[in-house]
Regions:
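Short alpha-helical "recognition helix" segments of helix-turn-helix
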Residues: 30-34
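Short, charged recognition helix plus adjacent turn
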Residues: 5-6, 74-99
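A short, Lys/Arg-rich alpha-helix, primarily the initiator
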Residues: 1-26
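DNA major-groove recognition helix of helix-turn-helix/homeodomain DNA-binding modules
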Residues: 56-73
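Recognition helix of helix-turn-helix/homeodomain-like DNA-binding domains
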Residues: 36-54
């Protein structure tokens, strides 16, 4: 895997984590909400999948849907959304009705 791919995985992970933070949703609640739309996964599996940042666009859209996200904030500078505090940065910059 190239360094560039790792940056994109970090962005995907932090986008989802930022959405969860801004909506106040835990992995346990995310698992319940996903189950309600037919996506069966447990809390531990979700935590591992998200922490790796390796998931499909379909999974990301399913998660954002059950979180009630209306749009996705993608920063122009990827460094704003990657790294140790990238998810917090995304959660703070999003308007209240978005992620």
């Amino acid at each position: 895997m190239s360094a560039s791919e790792k940056v994109w995985e970090e962005l995907a992970k932090n986008t989802l984590r930022g959405a969860m933070m801004s909506k106040g949703v835990s992995y346990a609640v995310l698992a319940e909400r996903l189950a309600a739309i037919g996506v069966e996964d447990n809390e531990l599996n979700l935590r591992n999948k998200v922490s790796r940042g390796r998931f499909t666009a379909v999974f990301l859209m399913q998660c954002l849907h059950v979180l009630g996200a209306e749009w996705i904030h993608l920063p122009k500078d990827l460094e704003d959304a990657t790294g140790k505090h990238g998810a917090q940065s995304l959660a703070k910059k999003a308007p209240p009705t978005s992620i």
